[in-house]
Amino acid sequence: MKLTFCCKLVTVYLLSALSIPALRAQLQPIGIFDHHQDVGDPALKGSAIYDAKEQTYTVTGAGVNMWTNIDQFHFLWKKIKGDFIIRATIRFIGKGAAEHRKIGVIARDKLTTDSRYADACVHGDILSSLQYRSTDGAQTEQVELSSYHPTDIEFQRSGNTFIFSAATFGETYKSVKKELPLNDEVYAGLFICSHLADVKETAVFSNVRIVIPADSNFRPYRDYIGSHIEVMDVQSGHRKILHSAPNSLQAPNWTPDGKYLIYNSEGLLYNYELATGKISTLNTGNANQNNNDHVLSFDGKQIGISHHVGQRRISTIFTLPVSGSDQPKQITMQDTLHSYLHSWSPDGKKLIFTGQRNGQYDIWSIDIATKKETALTQMATLDDGPEYTPDGKYI
């Protein structure tokens, strides 16, 4: 380091030290984001509202454009290091004043108006593109993705590769990508730009998720990166996170009365009460090494579980009342090797499961009363995941 720069560097560090507490004091956390603000000093001030019940972000902003070497927009950001995936369902409010109003997801080195960046940009007309500025102050460029209005977007960083994927609800994603060496830590999040200095536009972002991908040495079923329990409206696709945990939460069963979700975690089963969010342990007695193959009976009165028995940890099927039991009833024998439950018959008399028998995994049925097993498939390849139809005629 040259001595001639010493004073300037000291000044910068002092200013940074003084400004960091002030900046932290001014941060306005909103939902999963650290802050929201205008970038590029638009003539009209933007805003953002988080609806905690619906888990949606309503974002309003102005700005002449996000193009050439100057950007003006409203920005909800979070500082993220390394790889990430940001997903959102997007919707403009109203017809709009300019065809080139813009919404999307962006990653920037800085909060300056001419910062290097890459984004997933959806315009008010039929254009969607991955826009980028390769160096500070350079002209914006783009890689066009589509000529339709997507409802769902995903913006991914993998090293120096940025990938923009988009689709209309229910359709297949299309993708484009661009290599761009942004900083390892960037400001990433949601944006809106009206394309007009004297007009504000509004958009709603729902199903917003920030995902940090697993490490390259990730070992499935041995390493875990956390879990959300979500519910989804199957007509609209709108999702809500009910519960999050740093460990693995698996396979929620929705009770027929609509009151509970029953899920497994680290060998035990839990009740999640939908009305209150209260979580309680479901008593399964000594069956405390359960995997994620647990199933409610059609009437909702019984639950079947798959518990790993003994030192060999053989997955074995038990049944018990949905209210819990100290002594679940054993249905399959561990000396027949693994049995993974998948469905009750509608009359509650039989179970079907994936069974390890005769050196392969096939679909089996078992009579609960007699314990008699019947092979339904006999194939060398893995057969898995059988379910009864509600009328019990088909599997």
Where do the language-model regions lie?
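Bacterial Sec-dependent N-terminal signal peptides
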Residues: 1-27
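Intrinsic disorder/low-complexity segments
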Residues: 5, 18-23, 49, 53, ...
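Intrinsically disordered, low-complexity segments enriched in Ser/Pro/Gly/Ala and basic residues
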Residues: 6, 15-18, 128, 235, ...
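Serine/proline-rich low-complexity intrinsically disordered segments, especially terminal tails, linkers
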Residues: 8-9, 18-21, 136, 167, ...
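Extracellular glycan-recognition regions
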Residues: 26-218
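Sequence signature of WD/YWTD-type beta-propeller architectures
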Residues: 214-395
